[in-house]
Design a protein with these regions (language model features):
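Hydrophobic membrane-targeting segments
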Residues: 1-34
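A cross-family signal for key residues in well-ordered alpha-helices
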Residues: 13, 102, 119, 132, ...
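Bilayer-spanning, highly hydrophobic alpha-helical transmembrane segments
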Residues: 4-8, 113-143, 160-182
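Predominantly long cytosolic amphipathic alpha-helical stalk/bundle segments
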Residues: 26-125, 139-151, 178-212
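Alpha-helical transmembrane segments of multi-pass membrane proteins
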Residues: 14-23, 173-186
Length: 212
């Protein structure tokens, strides 16, 4: 029973924490995307975003912007080197794309943190409760055998323990599986926002490189 109580309390703590975290992340992402498309200078937006924490799209933007700045600095130092212009442009865009993908994967992994605990709770606690149920019934039969009678006073404690274990298992599993599916959907929405932003930012970088 203590194991089921632990899983129940821990899963509720995770549910509350992830609900707040994902809600804040979604609101922050929407605000930044609006600011991004309204911004006239990306360097100013980058400076403003440097102090922002807990926003996955900002982290992806910052990683891509830093890599783009690095590519431009390298190109400015190597202006005397003869090379294929198209090859240089593609190399720069690919470097920015790799930086964006790394940052996006890292942020998505952060969003998925502790979600697997809810899946574990949802799948394991019914079986733990079932084990408690079987154990309680076994105790009831043991009491019947030891006392040679099958009265209510003999079987009631074991049956009660069995039903409590079943109820605790379901009480832990049901909220966990509902929350898991809900959070997976929210993470999918945020992942789509990150992927769309990555593609849009990469297009902007590509056009900027080609215009130079």
């Amino acid at each position: 029973l203590l194991i089921l109580i632990f899983f129940s309390l821990a899963s509720w703590a995770v549910i509350i924490w992830k609900f707040i975290e994902l809600k804040r992340a979604k609101n922050a992402c929407d605000e930044f995307l609006t600011a991004f498309w309204q911004a006239k200078r990306l360097d100013q937006l980058y400076e403003e975003a440097a102090s922002v924490e807990g926003n996955p799209v900002v982290e992806v933007f910052a990683a891509g912007y830093r890599e783009a700045e690095h590519v431009l600095q390298v190109r400015s130092k190597n202006t005397s080197v003869e090379s294929s212009v198209l090859s240089a442009e593609l190399s720069g865009v690919e470097s920015v794309e790799r930086a964006l993908r790394r940052a996006a994967n890292h942020e998505i992994s952060n969003l998925e943190r502790l979600i697997t605990f809810l899946a574990t709770t949802a799948s394991a606690t019914p079986f733990i409760g079932l084990f408690g149920t079987v154990w309680g019934i076994m105790n009831s039969f043991r009491n019947i055998g030891s006392q040679g009678a099958a009265g209510l006073a003999v079987v009631a404690p074991g049956i009660s323990e069995a039903l409590i274990a079943t109820a605790l298992g379901l009480a832990a599993a049901i909220p966990a599986v509902i929350a898991y599916n809900h959070f997976q959907n929210q993470i999918k929405v945020l992942s789509d926002d990150i992927e769309n932003f990555t593609a849009d930012f990469l297009n902007l970088v590509g056009r900027h490189f080609m215009s130079m």
